């Protein structure tokens, strides 16, 4: 369709309609003295702003390149756009609610119900068109997800040599040359190979890196199961725009109902206001409540993503228990799990592991645990520990091997020493306010003894037995021997 895609053309068409009806409803609301029509016109304005924000955020988020200024790209632009739309709509609803309450205290009649009815019906039609357009966009987004899943499955089958008609099977038996040469002209597999050549080139580097890191793709060769287990990725940006359109549609319904009542049961100018005058503000308050009930969950979800909170559906306690039960792991700390965007979860963690054992097997098992939890972007930092050291030295199991080299930057750490989150340690028990590691089994990996403790360790007399603070000289000398979790 030339410069713009079909979806962009539909959105631009919706923008034009929204601008036109915003002006029409604003003028008609003042002429007809209808608070519902005025509120609906400002809902149209919010739709216009949300469309601009949604289009801009979607364009920014689709930028394919990552640079030194945006190492994660611009994927969160849609999250910011959705949050902006939801917050703006909430503020608008508050303004409308205040105006409706004032109208309840001083009710007024609708002067020209016929004009209000005509404009309200036309506005409702525009909103229905908008709902159909954005529902189509949401369906297009879901279709893209399903298409990606099918392409993953086709590439996996192609790698295993089990694509029908490409490396054997009934179609291959009909033409041996095509079976021998899957890239022969006219063969079905030739189209598949050409269609996926670019994507296979992009995945080549990741495949080599994963093989070097010791990952096993045999445990992740079921894309359909993977798509079912991971959290469903929703288009937050589209949800924000849909929320505005839905609110505007509800406002149009209120306008139509109020106008019909005044048109069927007109009030003369000399008659006092009766129950009819309360219909308009009452339905407006109900509309505000319905819109806010949909806006608050979107605000909560987008704010949780921007605050990098643990995603909903991730059981941290169960995950930590499984990680600490992996053979060879002495302790797990510095665990951070957050969402880049809805459905894309990222995890980082530090692992204490024996220095005389290779960590490839443990890395594979850890990634399997995260994979089954729906987390596929995992960064693991292994830290060596010598289990042959005396028991009094095993407090080192609780220490991070990579603290900052300077005490002055302690407050700049994501988890400063004063804030002690929970860590999992195999064979660790809490003793006198601090952990003790004298309860190891024969292999040091007894899962029954594993406990979740808040860790504050003392090393080389950095802290007294009663937790008394030290003077500045002693604290400076032993800072390099303490850390945070």
From Swiss-Prot:
GO terms for cellular component: early endosome; early endosome membrane; Golgi apparatus; Golgi membrane; membrane; plasma membrane; recycling endosome; recycling endosome membrane. Its main location: membrane. It is found in: Cell membrane; Golgi apparatus membrane; Recycling endosome membrane; Early endosome membrane. It is linked to Hypermanganesemia with dystonia 1: A metabolic autosomal recessive disorder characterized by dystonia, parkinsonism, extrapyramidal signs, severe hypermanganesemia, polycythemia, and chronic hepatic disease, including steatosis and cirrhosis. This is Calcium/manganese antiporter SLC30A10. SUPFAM superfamilies: Cation efflux protein transmembrane domain-like (SSF161111). The chain crosses the membrane at residues 11-31, 41-61, 82-102, 114-134, 245-265, 279-299. Calcium:manganese antiporter of the plasma membrane mediating the efflux of intracellular manganese coupled to an active extracellular calcium exchange. Required for intracellular manganese homeostasis, an essential cation for the function of several enzymes, including some crucially important for the metabolism of neurotransmitters and other neuronal metabolic pathways. Manganese can also be cytotoxic and induce oxidative stress, mitochondrial dysfunction and apoptosis. Keywords: Antiport, Cell membrane, Disease variant, Dystonia, Endosome, Golgi apparatus, Ion transport, Manganese, Membrane, Neurodegeneration, Parkinsonism, Transmembrane, Transmembrane helix, Transport, Zinc, Zinc transport. One of its GO terms (molecular function) is calcium:manganese antiporter activity. Residues 308-485 are annotated as: Required for plasma membrane localization. It is a multi-pass membrane protein. Belongs to the cation diffusion facilitator (CDF) transporter (TC 2.A.4) family. SLC30A subfamily. Specifically expressed in fetal liver and fetal brain. Expressed in adult tissues with relative levels small intestine > liver > testes > brain > ovary > colon > cervix > prostate > placenta. Expressed in liver and neurons of the nervous system (at protein level). Changing residue 47 to E: Loss of calcium:manganese antiporter activity. It holds the Pfam family Cation_efflux. Changing residue 43 to T: Loss of calcium:manganese antiporter activity. Uncoupling between manganese and calcium exchange. The keyword Transcription does not apply. Changing residue 25 to A: No effect on localization to the plasma membrane. Loss of calcium:manganese antiporter activity. Changing residue 43 to A: No effect on localization to the plasma membrane. Changed calcium:manganese antiporter activity. Enhanced coupling between manganese and calcium exchange. Forms homodimers. Forms heterodimers and high-molecular weight oligomers with SLC30A3, SLC30A2 and SLC30A4; heterodimerization is mediated by covalent-bound tyrosine residues, occurs probably in a tissue-specific manner and could mediate the intracellular zinc transport activity into early endosomes and recycling endosomes. Disulfide bonds: none annotated. It comes from the Eukaryota. The record marks 43 as: Important for coupling of manganese to calcium transport.
